[in-house]
Amino acid sequence: MGNCLKCFQSAAEQSMPTNASSPNSHNSNSNACQTATSLANCYESVGINPNANERCALETDELLSSRTPLKPAKANNCDTKRNSFKSLGLLNGSAPTMSDIITTAVQESMEVSHQTLSKLFDVYKDPDDEEMILTDGIERLCNDLNYQPDEFAILVLAWCLDASQMCRFTKVEFIEGLHKMRADTIDSIRVRLEQTIEMLKADAEMFKQLYRFTFRFGLEPDQRVLSLEMAIDLWKLVFTVQTPDLFSNWIHFLEKHPNIRRIPKDTWNMYLNFTEQCDIQNYDDTEAWPSLFDDFVDYEKSRALVSSGIHDDDNNNDDPLQSHVKAEDPGLVS
């Protein structure tokens, strides 16, 4: 489909006002019971709760409180540079897809009708392919959700639906994904997305699931590696709400070296580990990192020397990437 992100570049020109509605309260014998019941049924709201963002953490804790105790996150041997990605134990990260995570979180809440979801799908389906929502329909859906098509929230939506590729949602993906999310209106979809984004900010394992999905989501049909251009666009998108240290340096390094043509899956996956565990000073090139990371670290060290005035960059032709491109790394192509 070419550069699929360009399908999402049309800005939604209108904002859809949202109508607030509050969760139904249940009769109880005490104020404490009323509070607990209200939290436990917070997912029953099909309208936007104006206090959803403030209460997201409380809702999540209440919904998961009755589940089997989760295993504590394993300690990392290296210092984590992105502290905001430290797991807080909300989820154990074992679910293979976002649909499984959402199902676990809301499985005891309201049921939604497949018939209702089918009608919602019909609003956005393509007139020439009634089993698909394609670019025009996605843009209208984004507009109704009050998001731009290239926003982080739409990537999260694609993850929630377990979409197989960019620029389209199949009927099965749309209906089954929203059914597992327990969302059957535009307002309830937006609430679920807002809650999920807050959970992603707090839970590292959950973010890892989204991060790994993003690689698959960006692949062209029958391809196994991302083009460098697509990889850079997706890195910028997936790290919208949580930007790791040296991220701008990483992007600068990739853009400055046109002989880097593609990014394989292993390099994509291990970059997240790299951002969590290492920095330029404690990086160990004897460990099993992709050679592209070795070159990046060498490049950054050379830049640091130049900026400190130790040698003149104009006379320095010893670009580490140019001098020792490793042929075994499929991410580097001359």
UniProtKB/Swiss-Prot annotation:
Biased composition (Basic and acidic residues): 325-334
Gene Ontology molecular function, alphabetical: cullin family protein binding; ubiquitin conjugating enzyme binding; ubiquitin-like protein binding
Signal sequence, renumbered to the chain: none
Domain of life: Eukaryota
Phenotype on disruption: Viable but with decreased survival. Mutant females produce less offspring with wild-type males. No gross morphological defects and no effect on locomotor behavior. Ubiquitous RNAi-mediated knockdown is not lethal.
Cell location: Cell membrane
Any one biological process term the GO annotation gives: negative regulation of cell growth
Keyword S-adenosyl-L-methionine: no
Main location: membrane
A cellular component term, taken from the record's GO annotations: plasma membrane
Domain DCUN1 residues, every copy: 112-301
Pfam families (alphabetical): Cullin_binding (PF03556)
Keyword annotations from UniProtKB, A to Z: Cell membrane, Membrane, Ubl conjugation pathway
Annotated segments matching region Disordered: 308-334
Known function: Promotes neddylation of cullin components of SCF-type E3 ubiquitin ligase complexes and thus regulates SCF-type complex activity. Function promotes cell proliferation.
Protein's name in the database: DCN1-like protein 3
Species of the source: Drosophila melanogaster
Gene: SCCRO3
